[in-house]
Structures are given as C-alpha cells and as structure tokens.
Design a protein with these regions (language model features):
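Acyl-donor binding region in acyl/amide transferases
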Residues: 80-162, 167, 282-358
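Catalytic cores of nucleotide-enabled group-transfer and carboxylate-activating enzymes in metabolic
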Residues: 10-13, 33-36, 43-44, 51-60, ...
Length: 375
C-alpha cells in the first residue's frame, strides 16, 4: 500500500531533496543538484518566485520507505500572461511502480482541482530558469548541471496516466571546429556583421566587469524569451537571487556581450564550463571539498554548457550570433575546449538551431513537457 504525506517539516524536506540521491545512486548519467540550492528554491520564505507562485510538496511511502516525490506549483504570473489555468508539477521522481506514480499524480491533480485549475503540465519549475522537461531520449548521455535526468520508465508511467506531449526540447552536442577553413568562415561572417551593423565585443577581463551589464542582460532575456513556452518575466528580486547563486560559477572567458551601434547591448551569451563531473564527485555538497572541485572545473575544462543566449529582438538577422560565435569559438580553441552542450531548445525554435549550421552537431537528448486537461 502507498501512503502519501505532505511535506510539512524540515526532516520531510530533507527526505524530499535527498530521495533522488538514493534512486540514482548507481546511475552514471545522473548529475546531483546542490543540496543548498534545492533548500533555497523550495523555501517559501527565501525564494522570490513565491511572490507569484504557491506550491506544495508530497512524499510517497511504500513498505515504510520513501518511494517517490512530487511538487505541485501554481504560477499566477503564468496564468495571467497565458490565460491557461494550469498548475505545474515538478521535482517528480519515483521507483518503477505504477501504484506509486499513480498515487503521486492523483494527489497533485486533486490539489490542482481544489485550486480551480483546468489542467496540469510539467515537469516545470517556478520559472523558465529552473530545470524543466522530462527526459525521453538520451538516457545513456551524461546529464548537465542545469537539466533533469530521469529513468526511461518515467515516460511510460506518465503516458499511461493520460498525459500527452505539450512541448519538446532538444539538446545539441556541438564539436568545437578545429578545421581552419570553418573557423575562418565564422570569423569572416563576424567581421562582415561588425562592419555592416556597427557591432562590437565588450572587453571583459574580470568577473566584476560583467556586473554593470546585469540589469540590461536580464531585461533582454525577458524580451527575447517572452514568446517561448511557459515563460514568465524574471523579477528584479529573482535577478539578484540568480546572480548570487550562479555568479561564482562564471568564467569570464565564456561571457560574451555584444554592443550595437547605439552603445547598448545587442546580444549576450553566458556559457559555463561543465560542472557535471564536479557535481557527481561532490555528491551535492560544496563543503568541505566540493567547492575545490567546482573551482577546478570552472578554470580548466574541455566541455562547456551553453546556459543562456539572447539577442535583442529588433536586431535579429543582423549578424549578432556570428560575432558571438566567433568570439566564443576562438576562446574555446585557445583554452583547449573540445565540445559544447547547448541548453534545451524548443524543437520548433529553428532560429536558434540555425546558429550551429557551421558546426558538427548531433541531437543527443530530448525532453518533454506533458499536459493533462481535466474533464
């Protein structure tokens, strides 16, 4: 028999956060999150997303042991913007037992209906910068620090329970070109764009050089991403939170800011050296030795994770991506980088996918957002 309990205290929250560490203990492809980040994100008093979200967490027990977990989220900003009265589910994990998964979904759906929702979709976080999308292809590919990994049976369970595909993201593995002709072609396209549209690269020597541009970066992010699936604006309070969380993981070599003729930001790329191996070895903890592994990964790495890329909407088609790619490709080659992993891109986002046409690429993972409308 399965028993469901709402998370109401610290010990239950600890069980909620650490359950995947046991579920994926022997899985070489799962990348653990930082436990401290999970505690912050799920804390209603600290995470500024709770200014416009409400959420509940549940644990499933079978034979006296934790067998699954799920979060239910109502994002009021999403409902106001998109007009869909959908709840979200996230932080979904369970053993391969349909009785367990059904109990979890029964619980979150009942909660959503009580709140007046007309459907539920996920896996999604509080906002678009949280992890999202259930893995449906690429189970034998190493995950990244910013994406969800799950077992193949998750897909079978959720589809059996009546959920259908609502959106799909692809992840692209990009080989850094060593062919001089390819590199020269990218540089030529960048030079042409610089000359024609007055574009220039902002010189950055230290992390602190990025700080004056942070408000402009997030303002552009909100505008460039506003039409993407489920996206809601990032608030000023959230900006401060994300900067505090991730700024220490930045290597300024891989931050690219492009200015337009008017001196304002035309586009940006935020790339983070892969933290996957460091996270696995640290088992979700920065201390006592985890931070050393993270620092080493940030300073020297042959793999990059493309975290965020955005272009000013009115400057699309003006060569901004070429300038960005030229700068980042030359830096990557200089630092011995072999490959880059693009963060999830909607399968319908052909504009972003076209950025990689001069590179050798392969789609190595797919992830999906599922939807269930209530009768």
């Amino acid at each position: 028999m399965v028993k469901i309990e709402k998370v109401l205290n610290g010990s239950q929250l600890k069980e909620f956060i650490t359950f995947p560490f046991r579920l994926y203990k022997d899985n070489p492809y799962w990348i653990p999150p930082l436990i401290s980040d999970e505690k912050f994100t799920l804390n209603k008093k600290k995470n500024p997303a709770f200014d416009y979200c409400e959420a509940e967490l549940w644990l499933a027990y079978k034979d006296g042991k934790v067998a699954g977990r799920i979060a239910g989220i109502i994002n009021h900003s999403y409902i106001n913007k998109w007009g869909n009265r959908y709840a979200r589910f996230g932080w979904i994990d369970f053993i391969d037992d349909y009785e367990v998964s059904k109990a979890l979904f029964d619980t979150v759906e009942a909660w959503a209906k009580e709140k007046g929702m007309e459907g539920i979709h996920g896996p999604l976080g509080f906002c678009d910068l949280d992890k999202e999308g259930m893995l449906v292809e690429g189970f034998e590919e190493m995950g990244t620090f910013i994406t969800i990994y799950n077992y193949p049976y998750y897909k079978e369970h959720i589809e059996k329970y009546g959920y259908v595909k609502d959106a799909e993201w692809i992840e692209i593995d990009i080989s850094i070109p060593e062919d001089k002709d390819v590199v020269s072609k990218i540089s030529a396209l960048a030079s042409k764009a610089k000359e024609k549209y007055g574009l220039s690269v902002v010189p950055l020597k230290k992390n602190k050089d990025v700080i004056p541009y942070i408000p402009e970066v997030f303002d552009m992010l909100n505008k460039a991403y506003e039409h993407l699936y489920g996206v809601v604006p990032i608030t000023d309070k959230q900006v401060k939170t994300y900067v505090n969380q991730f700024f220490s993981f930045v290597n300024v070599d891989y931050i690219c800011l492009i200015k337009g003729q008017d001196g304002k930001l035309a586009g940006f790329g935020i790339i983070i050296p892969s933290l996957s191996e460091a996270a696995k070895k640290s088992k979700g903890r920065l201390f006592p030795f985890g931070f050393i592994r993270f620092l080493k990964a940030i300073k020297k790495n042959d793999t990059l994770d493309l975290y965020l890329v955005a272009i000013k909407p009115e400057l699309k088609g003006k060569g901004v991506p070429y300038v960005m790619l030229d700068e980042l490709t030359r830096t990557a080659l200089r630092n011995g980088v072999k490959r880059a992993i693009a963060s999830p891109e909607l399968e319908t986002n052909h504009a972003v996918q076209s950025m990689w046409r001069n590179y050798n690429t392969r789609i190595h993972r797919r992830r999906r957002c599922y939807l269930k409308r209530f009768d």
